[in-house]
């Protein structure tokens, strides 16, 4: 989509478009960009949503990504946007603080695309893909422990818990056992090594996902603290949005969608009253649901962009009520792995 607002259909690196933003039409319909508006794209990636927002209205976008390579790749789009786009290398959990630091408040909209980008999957050296051999890294930024560090240091019980709670993998225990056995023989430092270990435990049936999908998902979420980041980002958006501002979130698996659904349901719920307490108590709704339930991609998009297959979109509009206390949502996160003492196994 190209309009008189001045950015074309190339990707964020300036070359031919290759990263297809998932559910772009639905995102723009629910975000409803307007002229002179301020919008945050909390997950810039290849810039698909940012470009769509800039094309939809004569507005400004503050785009955030914790991956410095994504920020570097977006330099051409910044130039093309002629002062309407600011890129920031940071975590989207800090979107309210980042907006204030750049004199970009209050916000008229926030969009979040939760999950690994196709750019990261395409780069074997980033260690996200079980289909391309590379170092077992999976870090979206350039700091903190890698997936190889977790595989090397967690014991069998902790590994099984991580793979089950963050990957929803029902074979988590035998997978963890196989990982521990394999690392006793030699360090597991490559994505192909780990994928092969898991593939010996989980058989792939025709038409089903790769056996290592859920294990890799669990490690990626743990390495990048993705669920905690998501909860904090939702709370940050609640604080930063102006009345009437829109929050649009696209998720790709049930753990993320459950958090977003629970958050929006909680924030859109009116205070309850009873015959014992006829005066309703509790905070006023901070959001009004724009999408009644979940929005999913159409069959044409799924056929043309397999990444869209599991996508789910939820959207809400900020009311003029004060933001709710942020600390009431940490119970949405899976329980941490048990602490073990003694010899690692």
From Swiss-Prot:
- The question of whether S-adenosyl-L-methionine is a record keyword is answered with yes
Its Gene Ontology cellular component terms are:
cytoplasm
Q: Where does S-adenosyl-L-methionine bind?
A: 47-49, 65, 92, 113, 120
Enzymatic reactions: cytidine(1402) in 16S rRNA + S-adenosyl-L-methionine = N(4)-methylcytidine(1402) in 16S rRNA + S-adenosyl-L-homocysteine + H(+)
Give the residue ranges for region: Disordered. 296-345
User: Per its UniProt record, what Pfam families does this chain match?
Assistant: Methyltransf_5
Domain of life, per UniProt, equals Bacteria
**What InterPro entries is this protein classified in?**
RsmH, SAM-dep_MeTrfase_MraW_recog, SAM-dependent_MTases_sf
Alphabetical UniProt keywords: Cytoplasm, Methyltransferase, rRNA processing, S-adenosyl-L-methionine, Transferase
**Main location class:** cytoplasm
**Family annotation (Gene3D superfamilies):** Putative methyltransferase TM0872, insert domain, Vaccinia Virus protein VP39
> Where does the record say this protein resides?
Cytoplasm
> In its UniProt record, which GO terms are filed under biological process?
rRNA base methylation
Question: In the record, what terms sit under GO molecular function?
Answer: rRNA (cytosine-N4-)-methyltransferase activity
EC number(s) per entry: 2.1.1.199
* Presence of keyword Hydrolase: no
Stated family = Belongs to the methyltransferase superfamily. RsmH family.
Role noted for this protein: Specifically methylates the N4 position of cytidine in position 1402 (C1402) of 16S rRNA.
Q: Read off the HAMAP family from this record.
A: 16SrRNA_methyltr_H (MF_01007)
NCBIfam families with a match to the protein in the record:
16S rRNA (cytosine(1402)-N(4))-methyltransferase RsmH
Q: What's the protein name? A: Ribosomal RNA small subunit methyltransferase H
Which species expresses this protein natively?
Xanthobacter autotrophicus (strain ATCC BAA-1158 / Py2)
Q: Which gene encodes it?
A: rsmH
